[in-house]
Amino acid sequence: MRRRQTLVLGATGLLVTAAAIGIYFYGAFFGWWARPTVRNAPEAEPAAVEQLASGLRYPFDLAFLPDGSALVTERESGRLRQISPDGGLTDVRIIDEIAEPTVQAGLQGVAISPTYERDGWIYVYYTTEHDSRVSRLRLESSAPLEPILTGIPSGKIHNGGRIRFGPDGMLYITTGEADDRPRAQDQKDLGGKILRVTPAGKPAPGNPTAGSPVYSWGFRDPQGLAWDDKGQLYVSDFGHHNLDELNRVTPGGNYGWPEVEGTGGEPEFTDPIATWKPADASPSGMTYHDGRIWIACLRGERLYRIATDGSSPQQLLTGQYGRLRLVTPAPDGSLWVLTNGRSGPDHDLILRVTP
């Protein structure tokens, strides 16, 4: 933590120092609480919702293949499943390398190679007994998974786990600090970071530090990432007790955790563009669609739709389908939404939402 030193000169100095300390703590605490958060966001116009599939077990992520079907991961079972556009489910593979799953560990992210029709690669993020890692496989092959990035910290909680290819063709990976807070500020550690690697898992050209996969840091448990139509990256971060965050991410940016949660106003940290109370949000998967950012919320049991500057928030589906894990655009222009832990382990849904 940063240390502040104060020179005290007699009684007057003591009074001045006391006043300064009072002002500092007032600003640091009361001013922090006064920072704007997304509260009482209005309900958006009702959306058309269709139940596309049921009987899933804690799904975490979903990615579309070129043929219009999608792959969905189940965190606890380790199953990678394929869903057709009309909702038919087929088991593709069980990722049996995962550690015994916990409430926040297991099979998590999935991404499709941007050159899939040429190379056929599918990428998955999962926790093992020793680490979290990204591996790749081919749909029609029973060959062992090919690890491309290993050594990401893992724990019972705070494992991040979302993976997406960016507009630049590089693979972006969200990692949590695995319940070890100092990791997030250690630039040599892979926990509490956004990582950026080539499709082969090597540090991507142009990263802030040559030879390092670290793109930005200071995150607690980031589970959502998306790009707008100008190529700007946004990341959602799951807060502790105070505030969740929506961040506009730049290479080399430090987003504050554990020094700051929410808006701190410190020059060495990048403040979020929007914050929520965890009871209202607890953000997970997110996307950019129709000019706005969409975020699926776990504790908040809703979708948030918000402008890219953090303004004009609206909420949808509030309390209707339980905890929401992911929202992602489908080829037909709709949004597909994953529920998470809906009244039982095998009761989760895939919803098709047309705003």
Model-identified regions with their sequence ranges:
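N-terminal Sec-pathway targeting helices
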Residues: 1-17
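Repeat-solenoid scaffold signature
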Residues: 214-242
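Repeated scaffold domains used in trafficking and secretory/extracellular systems
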Residues: 324-326
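Short, surface-exposed recognition loops and adjoining beta-strand edges that mediate ligand/DNA contacts
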Residues: 151, 158, 204-224
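Blade/loop signatures of beta-propeller domains
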Residues: 24-48, 202-208, 254-269
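Beta-propeller blade signature
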Residues: 134-141, 187-199, 249-250, 350-355
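C-terminal soluble interaction/assembly domains
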Residues: 311-321
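Acidic, Gly/Ser/Thr-rich repeat motifs that build Ca2+-stabilized beta-propeller blades
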Residues: 22-180, 232-239, 280-313, 328-355
